[in-house]
Amino acid sequence: MNNVHIIKPLSLPQRFFSCIFHPLLLIFFTSVILTIWGSFSVIDITMAKMSHAQVKRNDTVSTFASISTATATATTTATTTATMTAVTTQHAIYSANSYSLNKTFIDNTIDQYFESKLRSIESTVGTDMQEKFKSYTDDILDNKQKLINDQISLETELIKEVLEVNNTIFNELLTKSQLINDTWNEISEDAMTIDKDSISQMASNLLLNYSMFDSIFGNYSRKLKSLQNFNGTITDFSTQLDTSSTLSLNFLRNSTDWLQLKRNFTANLQNEISILSGGSTEVTSSTSIIKRSLKTNSEENSVLSAVKNHVFRKCKRMTIIFTVMYFAFVILLMAIERILFQLENQQVNLVMSQINGLTGQTNFTKYNKVLKSLITTLNLSTLYPIPYQLTKLINQKIFKREPEKIDDKKVKKSKLFYCNWWIISNGAHLWLFGFLMLLIHWQIVTRLTNFEVPSLPTFHKRAGPSLYKREVWTDGNITTTIEGFINDSVSLLCENFQMEVNEKFITANLSLQTDPNLKVQSTDILNLWVNDTNTQFEKYLNESSQNWQGIDLQVEPLLGSDSINEFLGQYFLPTYEVTNTNSSFALDIQKYGIINRGINITNASVAALSSLSKRQIKDKEQKQTYFLHTVYKWGLLAVCLTILFHHMLIFIILKL
């Protein structure tokens, strides 16, 4: 006890630094972070095991079906790990006629498809050509407006120059007139004797007339004023095109390329149908159990991944919250240490002043050593009376029995007794701290494990808790399987056919620069549009003639004879917008283009899954459901006990 410090021998910066590594805060928040991410690790591992177990369960019952068209034999086999009882198996012989094409319907469907494709292309190309032609016309309007403005500016400058010449001549004549007037005045002042008639005649002869300039240059002034006040514009002119004039693509219906594509598609359909179904088919069928799981592997993985990401976001959010709380508590401790440091300095200064006043001594260290033991004993006996008295009795017994053999081991033993008695008698705050830690860790783990895996879509025909449905390979199964292969093949052929039409035929034949028929039609349509545009533009100028009065400006037609060739040279048909596919094309051929002449069945097969197998599968699912909750409960209990034991040891070590 002689090593107890009455005053902390640390400076204020050292105290601030020690607040960052305060044992209680560091242990508390470190254990919380470990609990958060430890729980996440347990959840992650458990979900991985569940996913692995689910994959195994999905693979427990499987069915393999194969249909051989070469030998016209369909075989189905099944394997299952469940106990099978009361399973009956029979074999059936099927004789089926071959599938055939409804060629009339297929030809009409192809023609309708191509007709709708051409109409769609005509509409798209017509709209696009009108938009591009209007844009071309707007560009020409902008250029023409710029030329008009430039011409008006040029004429304005020329008229200003002429008026400047007018002003120069006028000023010169005005100067000469003033000079003549001054000369006449001087002559009059010299008292020349002239009769009145002679004076009038001389005055009229000496007068300089400049009124003629008003009539000569007046027109220029008025024209300049008109040009300066001109506000006419042609950019607000809008073209109205004839929408009834569009390209006609009917000539493509008789092209050799299209007829060849049509023949190839029909031949490919016939070959595919002939391969998938022969003229006579003998099928040997055996019963099989087909599993329909509640969940597919991809859906399970996506759901478990979503739950894992949700828990991971919770862990990150909790980590950020407790990290902020840790630094907030550190700042609070620093503020408390600052206040305590000031109070201690005041108390030390007060004690030193009192000691100096009583003894005249200034050596505070000497008095600290003298009074240290007494003050420490008084402090312990006041704050912890019961442990102090018990420790005192234990030490007295040790000194009485073997005072000469007292060593460090016995001293440590006495301190250990002291710590135990202190925990029992005065450790209420320790137990409160432990209870608080237990409560916080419990809440953290509970919130992290409080989630629900959403139910996945089921494949069942009626409501029920069963996980597996049985399905028997009967005549309908065999027919459905063969038709499934045929539908898949027909869909692929139709898709390839439409891609070939879009990417090869349409792209190769829709070109204004290379196809003479399209070029002639486009030229005729553009001639009509050019004439209509020029007529509308002339009408527009006549209606807005008040803006053009007073200026001598000749506006030519908007579009010239070379506009058509210029537009055709820069316009390309939008083939990228007409390469869409029609999904109903394949569906119509699958539904009405394939003829099934019938199937004759001589026997059927039945299979059943035993009740014991169903119970085993159900029990396995229930165990899988409660497995996660059991892991969480025992894991939470183990974590809480470890935390409590850990904190007790830490406090014991700190008080030694």
UniProtKB/Swiss-Prot annotation:
Which terms are listed as keywords in the entry?
Membrane, Transmembrane, Transmembrane helix
Highest taxon of the source? Eukaryota
Q: Where in the cell is it found?
A: Membrane
A GO term from the CC aspect: membrane
Q: Which GO terms describe its biological process?
A: karyogamy involved in conjugation with cellular fusion
Task: Please give the record's induction comment.
Answer: By pheromone.
According to UniProt, the name of this protein is Pheromone-regulated membrane protein 2
UniProt organism field: Saccharomyces cerevisiae (strain ATCC 204508 / S288c) (Baker's yeast)
Where is the organism placed in the taxonomic lineage, from the top? Answer: Eukaryota, Fungi, Dikarya, Ascomycota, Saccharomycotina
